[in-house]
Amino acid sequence: MGYGGGGSGGGGSGGGSGGGSAGGVIGGVGGTGAAVGRTKKFLGSRGIMSGGATPNRNTIDFWNIPVLSSALDFGDLSIGRQHMSSCSSGIRLITFGGNNPPDASRIDFNTFLTLGDATDFGEMTGERSSGTNRVGSAPDGNRGVFMGGTSPTTGLSNIDYITIGTTGNAIEFSKMTANRDGQAGCSDGVRGLTAGGNPPQNHVELVNISNLSDAVDWGEIPVAQIFSGDAGTSDGSRGVFVGGYGGGTDNRDNVQYVTIGTLGQSADYGELFNGNYGATNSSDGTRMCTAGGSEPTGYATTIQYHQISQGGTALDFGEITQARGMAGHDSGG
């Protein structure tokens, strides 16, 4: 099905139930904040936005997150597509899946500090698109995780992983608690969270990235959303989810946060310029940049930003090279 007001909505449907036991996934998670003593390798000063809709784009943009500016051309994806999901080791950007159509199983990679076209990395365990299935890519600097998605219209509970520094095919990691698509993800380097989903929901699941065990319930975000594109990011402790779709023509302007290391701690703490479904998000650990997306007047070229520690109303950062949404997006370098 299609959804999303403004520009054209993304496709995909899911829901239903899946499997998954706790299996010790929480590990060291408690009420004491983020992972301690770890370098947040997956954060960096260069934001990269890949592909998007509509039509299917192969464009890759980049910008310097600490400096207000417009994006520049970085290169091209292997094929134009939308509804992908990205993750980062800080050195290498990975782009999973997407919809051309049909759904794709391909995985591309770029090196953050080397301008150029994407290179083939390998294949996912099956053809899946993200965006309408924004699956949580949750990197610890070495392992990238892809959760849920649709193929082609059925929500999945699969969790795939890759070793970011080594090209090759993805391996099935474990299962989510239910079949889900339309989520957004974030990580503190140890724990990965995936929030929201289709139909609009506020459920949040947790996976320990280093353990091959099933996801467990984390809690809820305040506002039920379908997310699309890489709408989640973090500063290594606080995870942030932007915009989303609530049904009908209801594109949301909410900015919501979670404290990744504290089960159930979340709040609605800011706003985007407009209701926006399909915006993408990245962070350098201090500043969060939100790019593109579908707004009431159509697809946007805007890059907006927040200081993650403060929230509030978004401020103007610059422009991307093409109006689009439902893209891949992360930071490194």
Residue ranges and their predicted role:
Residues 1-333:
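Polar, enzyme-active/binding microenvironments
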